[in-house]
Amino acid sequence: MNNNFDFTVDKASKKVFIDMDFDADISSVWDAFTRPEILDQWYAPKPWTSKTKHMNFEVGGRRFYAMVGPDGTEMWAVQEYTSITPKTNFQFFNAFADKDENPQLPGSDWDLNFTDQGESTKVNISIYNESLERMERMIAMGFKEGFTATLQNLRAMLENKVPG
């Protein structure tokens, strides 16, 4: 298994590309990205945790969640689902938000693709930023390191999953 993630920044297109493989079946990986009770187990870099206030995984639906720091600090975000093809692809608009669910623009458009490779699953993520400045600020704030740590949480969770 490859423990690394391919993380590429393309300033010309204002996109970030992340490619990874997980030693888990596609259903388990899909569920990890689309079910709030599973997302909250891995979707934050330690020692932070994820707390979903509500999630409606359907086109036009939203996930409203916070990343909660060890001191109780809450950083809220909202994801608005724009396209879903089960176990293949989903897309959403992501933006930081206040505690009342008001997005703080600009945001970014995420496109996640899932490929069944038998006993493993490939996930390709493309993140389009509305402005180069937003993308550069996101990278400067430690997005690569934070999201890589978050994906390592997912990998560890999937590897320790008990079938059934």
Model-assigned labels for residue ranges:
Residues 17, 37-74:
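Short beta-edge strand/loop motif at the mouth of beta-sheet-based domains
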Residues 99-145:
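Beta-strand/loop substructures that line and gate deep hydrophobic ligand-binding cavities in soluble
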Residues 1-49:
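Hydrophobic ligand-binding cavity/cleft-lining segments
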Residues 18-20, 52-53, 77-83, 108-115:
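Hydrophobic/aromatic beta-strand elements that line small-molecule binding cavities or substrate pockets
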Residues 13-19, 26, 62, 76, ...:
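Intrinsic-disorder/low-complexity, polar/charged segments enriched in Ser/Thr/Lys/Arg/Asp/Glu/Gln
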Residues 26-27, 56-58, 82-89, 113-122:
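A short, structured loop/turn motif at beta-sheet edges
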Residues 29, 39, 63, 81, ...:
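Hydrophobic pocket/interface hotspot
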Residues 158-164:
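Short, highly charged C-terminal tails/helix-capping segments
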